[in-house]
Amino acid sequence: MELNCVQFLRNKTILVTGATGFLAKVFVEKILRVQPNVKKLYLLVRASDNEAATKRLRTEVFEKELFKVLRQNLGDEKLNTLLYEKVVSVPGDIATDQLGINDSHLRERMQKEIDIVVNVAATTNFDERYDVGLGINTFGALNVLNFAKKCVKVQLLLHVSTAYVCGEKPGLIPEKPFIMEEIRNENGLQLDINLERELMKQRLKELNEQDCSEEDITLSMKELGMERAKLHGWPNTYVFTKSMGEMLLGKHKENLPLVIIRPTMITSTLSEPFPGWIEGLRTVDSVIIAYGKGVLKCFLVDVNSVCDMIPVDMVANAMITAAAKHAGGSGVHMVYHVGSSHQNPVTFGEIHEIAVRYFTKNPLRSRNGSLITVSKVRFIPTMALFSLYMTLRYKLPLQLLKLVDIIYPWRNGDKYGDKNRKIELVMRLVELYEPYVLFKGIFDDRNTKSLCANQKEEEIKNTEKLMFDFDPKGINWGDYLTNIHISGLVTHVLKK
């Protein structure tokens, strides 16, 4: 065990899958910034060949604003030299055997050199196609494990999952691995992952034999994923396939040290490499921005429920610290919840109040340049009440519009069809988000708390400063949301 993280990273060769993803970028940037003497970073990306992989890494990772601090510290020439010497682009795909690394010489070299394998690759769409979700989140995780076992120097597999693999359980969610043989739904049906794959393949075969369009196949595979997830007690395909991935890792790890990081909702950087950096709208961010744009009038949420968020740089710090602690540890199978609900909770109601104050003071502009005035949102605490509200507020008036369209088809075009599609989209999104906005669980994080305390003690003793902080108690939610996160969304996502 070594909790001097900077020293631990020195001369290490690390494979990172899903390297163009939000969390992976922050993880890679942190390593290069604090330990330029890392030996090598093999970064796996989906690409047709090495040239395409290198181009993706350059445009989607290293040219991003995230790397501006490193670029300022080193200058363009030295940074480019560092990337040339330390980073190896690897075209591949974890959904395929050997991670899709077709270059046998590269594959053999990697298996001789790699010390740490970090699996961040995932599809995070809640209603992903079942074949895609199983391919990446479930059996892709197993492919990464099998590749790691072939690495002769490997000290650890660190797998990034999600805290929401717990499903919709209320109360204190335990920080422990899944035991596949213990997984049964409320009717006693035991989960069989291989059977799930066979069911998926059979459905896909039937659809192809029927000459279904790609659109119909996609819709059918999405429906199958949601159907199987709910049958076994999970709310959606994403968390179901991620949980099965964890189960396969636990069952087949043998003696390989395994650490599973389960972050909650990942948000913008708290402090490193600079505050507020984020890519895309993530979970609760979509709601915040919709509110700022004045288009959110009502929303399904229990304002007293905790919204478990954690800044992305804290997740990266926890990953590095956990790797340093457990690398080379015999028989290790550790789970870390990285979130805030247990030690420093913030509710949806509190977030709304902060958003009201922010957008009242800093209003967005509409397309015509006028300032957007926000008002408080009508929050509806149950799905039944939300459906009733939508029926009375929108669906009944829509029936009148349908009648007008039928009687006077030349006057309105298909206004009914257009508005009905929008309402159906809203209801679909609400159904997907329901498990999270009404979530009643709190994530036990005693493992993470202990890891964080040990790391703080080690850092203060040796360096007198914190370089790998991931203590959620240090987050001031009012300051973070107002001055860092929401302003970061406006700057980096809306480009205002």
UniProtKB/Swiss-Prot annotation:
InterPro entries: FAR, FAR_C, Far_NAD-bd, NAD(P)-bd_dom_sf. Induction: Induced by wounding and salt stress. Keywords: Lipid biosynthesis, Lipid metabolism, NADP, Oxidoreductase. Gene3D superfamilies: NAD(P)-binding Rossmann-like Domain (3.40.50.720). It catalyses: a long-chain fatty acyl-CoA + 2 NADPH + 2 H(+) = a long-chain primary fatty alcohol + 2 NADP(+) + CoA. Changing K242I: Loss of enzymatic activity. Expressed in the endodermal cell layer surrounding the central vasculature in roots. Expressed in floral organs of very young unopened buds and receptacle of siliques. Its EC number is 1.2.1.84. Changing A355L: Catalyzes the formation of C16:0 fatty alcohol instead of C18:0. Signal peptide: none annotated. Catalyzes the reduction of fatty acyl-CoA to fatty alcohols. Catalyzes specifically the formation of C18:0 fatty alcohol. Provides the fatty alcohols required for synthesis of suberin in roots, seed coat and wound-induced leaf tissue. Provides the fatty alcohols required for synthesis of alkyl hydroxycinnamates in root waxes. Belongs to the fatty acyl-CoA reductase family. This is Probable fatty acyl-CoA reductase 5.
